[in-house]
């Protein structure tokens, strides 16, 4: 309410869900004083599918595809968290080649996510060329997904104890051949946006988050690194073969939209660095071997064995009808997903289905801060701030 006259009221508008900058099904109710944002009220739940409840009625193997449908921009990163949780409860070690393939595909997922975010963030502030370049590269990466798993998006490729099948040698060569030309595309995007006067005016000093605020709001990933903390689960709590990988963690110093953009650009370069190391290790003698654990109580036996051995046939039948029995216990497993810390809190009761599977989506904590981030900014800045948060509604609404 304005001080001077009771007749002057704030103006309320709906931003989305049909808005092009609303990234899916976001609905923001904005309260404006002129063109200055006074209050932002995000309305969520338009993509709610009851994932956590559905997982309780499915076996551990059947629950896997639900994770692809959370952050559907980088699907395999979520499967990773669920697999890690179940593996820790089972107390099993994934074969080295399986770990390498997982890390390789997690980094491909990071590229998929950052490419989409950086280019659509640019589109939200008016640059129309980057999305066209970004989608061309994403297309190539999705073909790599398809060649590994048979599906472009909802891969369902990771398994408890490794991955579903080995990569063909030609695919490893093609991923290797993709890396260097891709860095050139990142440089082209860099040239187009980083020094661009309009892009900087729209992003510098917009949506500033101090490090203290980032911790208080429960931020993770790029949102924390943009404010100056070198916090990355791949370094601080390494999983699979990340401990062997050499890469740097880019951090910002201003905590604004521009810093977050720069970090995502640098993270793409670091991801390519990790991918190259994975490919070298996959080709090395110690990178050969099985991609899935050989325990037939957890992973299916090979087709050839099933034709010869009755035991293998029984194992196969039991595994796909009844599923894996995970020992009772509870565990929290988190991975450094492209959007932040994606965690799975898994409670097992000794049966073939999870008792409870709580999903900690990074985008949820970031979206709830929209009000605090946008207050005092102009209406046009709302889409710039939203673009830098990197929100996907599959994981927010679950």
Swiss-Prot record:
Its main location: membrane. Transmembrane segments: none annotated. It catalyses: a quinone + NADH + 5 H(+)(in) = a quinol + NAD(+) + 4 H(+)(out). Its EC number is 7.1.1.-. GO terms for molecular function: NAD binding; NADH:ubiquinone reductase (non-electrogenic) activity; quinone binding. The keyword Translocase applies. It is a peripheral membrane protein. One of its GO terms (cellular component) is plasma membrane. InterPro entries: NADH_Q_OxRdtase_suD, NADH_UbQ_OxRdtase_49kDa_CS, NDH1_su_D/H, NiFe-Hase_large. It is an enzyme of class 7 (translocase). Keywords: Cell inner membrane, Cell membrane, Membrane, NAD, Quinone, Translocase, Transport, Ubiquinone. It is found in: Cell inner membrane. NDH-1 is composed of 14 different subunits. Subunits NuoB, C, D, E, F, and G constitute the peripheral sector of the complex. PANTHER family: NADH DEHYDROGENASE [UBIQUINONE] IRON-SULFUR PROTEIN 2, MITOCHONDRIAL, NADH-UBIQUINONE OXIDOREDUCTASE 49 KDA SUBUNIT. Belongs to the complex I 49 kDa subunit family. NDH-1 shuttles electrons from NADH, via FMN and iron-sulfur (Fe-S) centers, to quinones in the respiratory chain. The immediate electron acceptor for the enzyme in this species is believed to be ubiquinone. Couples the redox reaction to proton translocation (for every two electrons transferred, four hydrogen ions are translocated across the cytoplasmic membrane), and thus conserves the redox energy in a proton gradient. This is NADH-quinone oxidoreductase subunit D. The gene is nuoD.
């Amino acid at each position: 309410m304005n001080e001077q006259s009771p007749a002057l009221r704030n103006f309320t508008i709906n931003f989305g869900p049909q808005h092009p900058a609303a990234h899916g099904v976001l609905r923001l109710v904005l309260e404006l004083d002129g063109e200055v944002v006074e209050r932002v009220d995000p309305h969520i739940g338009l993509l709610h599918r009851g994932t956590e409840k559905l997982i309780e009625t499915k076996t551990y193997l059947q629950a896997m595809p639900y994770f692809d449908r959370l952050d559907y921009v980088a699907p395999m990163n979520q499967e990773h968290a669920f697999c890690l949780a179940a593996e820790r409860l089972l107390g099993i070690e994934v074969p080295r080649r399986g770990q390498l393939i997982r890390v390789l595909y997690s980094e491909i997922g990071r590229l998929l996510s950052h490419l989409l975010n950086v280019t659509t963030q640019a589109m939200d502030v008016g640059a129309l060329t980057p999305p066209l370049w970004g989608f061309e590269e994403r297309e190539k990466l999705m073909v790599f997904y398809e060649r590994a798993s048979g599906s472009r998006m909802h891969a369902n490729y990771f398994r408890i104890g490794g991955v579903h099948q080995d990569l063909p040698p030609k695919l490893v060569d093609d991923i290797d051949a993709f890396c260097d030309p891709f860095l050139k595309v990142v440089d082209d995007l860099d040239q187009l946006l980083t020094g661009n006067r309009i892009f900087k005016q729209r992003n510098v000093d917009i949506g500033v988050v101090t490090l203290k605020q980032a911790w208080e709001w429960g931020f993770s990933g790029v949102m924390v690194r943009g404010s100056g903390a070198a916090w990355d689960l791949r370094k601080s709590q390494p999983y699979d073969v990340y401990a062997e990988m050499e890469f740097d963690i880019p951090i910002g110093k201003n905590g604004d939209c521009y810093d977050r953009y720069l970090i995502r650009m640098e993270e793409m370069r670091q991801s390519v660095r990790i991918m190259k190391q994975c490919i070298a290790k996959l080709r090395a003698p110690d990178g050969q071997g099985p991609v899935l654990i050989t325990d037939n109580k957890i992973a299916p036996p090979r087709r050839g064995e099933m034709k010869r051995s009755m035991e293998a046939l029984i194992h196969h039948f039991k595994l796909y009808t009844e599923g894996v029995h995970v020992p009772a216990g509870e565990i929290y497993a988190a991975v450094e997903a492209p959007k932040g810390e994606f965690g799975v809190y898994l409670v097992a009761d000794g049966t073939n289905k999870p008792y409870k599977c709580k999903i900690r989506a990074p985008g949820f904590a970031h979206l709830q801060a929209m009000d605090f981030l946008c207050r005092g900014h102009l209406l046009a800045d709302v889409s710039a701030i939203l673009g830098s948060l990197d929100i996907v509604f599959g994981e927010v609404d679950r």
